Curated annotation (Swiss-Prot):
One of the record's GO molecular function terms: ribosomal large subunit binding
Transmembrane stretches, start-end: none
The protein's name: Ribosome-recycling factor
PANTHER family: MITOCHONDRIAL RIBOSOME RECYCLING FACTOR PSEUDO 1 (PTHR20982:SF3), RIBOSOME RECYCLING FACTOR (PTHR20982)
InterPro entries in alphabetical order: Ribosome_recyc_fac, Ribosome_recyc_fac_dom, RRF_sf
Keyword terms, alphabetized: Cytoplasm, Protein biosynthesis
GO cellular component entries: cytoplasm
Record-level GO BP terms: translational termination
Primary residence: cytoplasm
Family: Belongs to the RRF family.
Localization in the cell: Cytoplasm
Length: 186
């Protein structure tokens, strides 16, 4: 039997929640430093604010080093100031052409702190998923009361919504489990 339109819409919302959580997780540093850790950094340059990615190319040189190559070397002081303000966990150093960020190895305490942050993001996403599910189930019940849906159809859609919820919740848990494992690796 074909999935109901309401369930399809709920799945889209569930997927957006997972995407948001994944974006949050990409900013959490694991054992390997990733350019995504600098996504939230904004740079004030010539009176305007820019995302770092709009002003420079960011690449991982190795597991602990990021290289930032600005499109224009005159931006280096502004980018360095922004990196220091953003408190990304490494002090910028430049050679006049590019900025280098060398991150220290993560202590066990810091790893545990980051794992707790991953758990926090997972719980926020779970709450969002539950709210989405509740919203759509309420919509189905409302349509049933208005006689737009039969009782059987309503029950079938609610079961579809529950199955979709469980499927997306499991996906989120797997994503977070991988991130936790990545963080705890030496």
């Amino acid at each position: 039997m074909k999935e109901h339109e309401i369930t399809r819409q709920a799945r889209e919302h569930f997927q957006k929640t997972i995407n948001t959580m994944s974006d949050q997780l990409s900013t959490v540093r694991a054992s390997r430093v990733s350019p995504a850790i600098l996504e939230p950094v904004t740079v004030e340059y010539e009176g305007a604010k820019y995302k770092l990615s709009e002003l420079a190319m960011v690449v991982a040189q190795d597991a602990r080093t990021l290289i930032i190559e600005p499109w224009d070397v005159s931006m280096i002081p502004a980018i360095s100031r922004s990196l220091q303000k953003a408190n990304v966990g490494a002090n910028p150093s430049d050679d006049g052409k590019r900025i280098k960020l060398v991150f220290p190895s993560l202590s066990q305490e810091r790893r545990e702190e980051l794992a707790r942050l991953v758990d926090k993001y997972l719980e926020e996403a779970r709450i969002a998923l539950r709210n989405i599910r509740r919203e759509y189930i309420d919509e189905v019940k409302s349509k049933e009361k208005k006689k737009e849906l039969s009782e059987d159809e309503s029950r079938r859609i609610q079961n579809e919504l529950q199955k979709a919820f469980e499927e997306y919740e499991k996906q989120m848990e797997q994503i977070c489990q991988r991130k936790r494992k990545e963080i705890m690796e030496e």
